[in-house]
Amino acid sequence: MKITEPIIKEAQEKMTKAEDSLRRELGNIRAGRANASLLNRINVEYYGAPTPLNQMAQISVPEARVLLVTPYDKTSLKNIEHAIMASDLGIAPMNDGTAIRLVIPQLTEERRKELAKQVKAVSETGKVAVRNIRRDMMDALKKAQKNGDLTEDDLRDLENQAQKVTDESIKNIDKITEDKEKEVLEG
């Protein structure tokens, strides 16, 4: 029975990582409110190397729909502005010479529905990842049984345990998705 504990534990850890990945991915979908995580994926050309924006500037939220990007090095202001314009955010940066303001526009009803669909698609990708982890876990358990490390009864018990772990992870993903959809649709 001991040989299978790492299999279940590893699968649980992978499922938790899949949930965390989903949270990060959904965090990039903006819901009409300013959130510093919107800028996490932006890299700025800095002394010839692409550098994450959050490593070269302070990002704050002075108002509900405004992000303020204050670079640590004022000479990088233009590069930051260009990187934001080149991104897929669809937000025009306003450079005041010392910082960049990003005003998040109000979302239209149509755009909210589009974002809700995007949330569902990202969520489904997370569920597929969890199911793939479950499949790999089941394969490993069956292999252990085939090698004589498990009895039929042990295998059945562990398969039930694996299913519970999977169901819990899917339930967490559904909750994360529901919360994000509500955030997007209500704005």
Swiss-Prot record:
Pfam families per record: RRF
Domain of life: Bacteria
A GO cellular component entry from the record: cytoplasm
Keywords from the UniProt entry: Cytoplasm, Protein biosynthesis
GO molecular function: ribosomal large subunit binding
A Gene Ontology biological process term: translational termination
InterPro entries: Ribosome_recyc_fac, Ribosome_recyc_fac_dom, RRF_sf
Protein's UniProt keywords contain Kinase: no
SUPFAM superfamilies the record matches: Ribosome recycling factor, RRF (SSF55194)
Subcellular locations according to the entry: Cytoplasm
Function: Responsible for the release of ribosomes from messenger RNA at the termination of protein biosynthesis. May increase the efficiency of translation by recycling ribosomes from one round of translation to another.
PANTHER family tied to this protein: MITOCHONDRIAL RIBOSOME RECYCLING FACTOR PSEUDO 1, RIBOSOME RECYCLING FACTOR
Family according to the record: Belongs to the RRF family.
HAMAP family xrefs: RRF
Protein name, entry field: Ribosome-recycling factor
Organism: Ligilactobacillus salivarius (strain UCC118)
Gene name of this polypeptide: frr
